[in-house]
């Protein structure tokens, strides 16, 4: 099985990423730095994309690249909704339902009109203790990107967060 065919193997890596990619603090300056990393990464790929970062319901960063499509705003909204409700990356939710042969509707009672289980949405976690695996950490927002194939959307967000935090993370192999 190739990397995109094995949801269980992907979920192991995604769970590790989600445990590691947590902030000690997050403010508008942090959002600006992270958003600009994502914007620069899209431009380096000559990709049309949209980026949004929100915390506690407040929009802290939003941008598009020149060739972004108008529909990407709706993808951002749907991925953000998924992350904010389920506190997992939108790609992890997609891999879970692929593994289980389910849909958003059957697994979570969610309509695809308002939710998306596609890569690019990532939870914004704040640590409340020193351990990255501490169950009392709090999901306070989302970091969302749309414009690339979903696996690449996810990888770009996870890589940018890791770069900003200056940590190494396990990576999913690139989309095939």
Language-model segments: what does each one mean?
Residues 29-32, 97-107, 166-170, 174:
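Short, positively charged
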Residues 84-85, 155-176:
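Short, solvent-exposed cationic patches
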Residues 6-13, 17, 28, 99, ...:
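Amphipathic, alpha-helical segments enriched in basic
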Residues 105-165:
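Extended hydrophobic
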């Amino acid at each position: 099985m190739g990397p995109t065919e094995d949801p269980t193997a992907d979920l192991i890596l995604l769970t590790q990423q989600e445990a590691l990619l947590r902030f000690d603090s997050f403010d508008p300056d942090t959002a600006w730095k992270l958003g600009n990393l994502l914007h620069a990464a899209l431009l380096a790929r000559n990709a049309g994309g949209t980026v949004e970062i929100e915390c506690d319901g407040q929009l802290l960063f939003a941008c598009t690249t020149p060739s972004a499509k108008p529909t990407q705003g709706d993808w951002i909204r749907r991925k953000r909704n998924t992350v904010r409700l389920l506190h997992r990356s939108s790609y992890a939710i997609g891999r879970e339902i692929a593994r289980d042969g389910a849909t958003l509707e059957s697994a979570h009672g969610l309509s695809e009109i308002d939710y998306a289980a596609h890569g690019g949405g990532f939870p914004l976690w704040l640590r409340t203790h020193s351990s990255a695996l501490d169950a009392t950490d709090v999901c306070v927002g989302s970091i969302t990107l749309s414009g690339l194939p979903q696996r690449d959307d996810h990888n770009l967000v996870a890589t940018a967060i890791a770069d900003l935090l200056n940590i190494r993370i396990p990576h999913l192999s690139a989309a095939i």
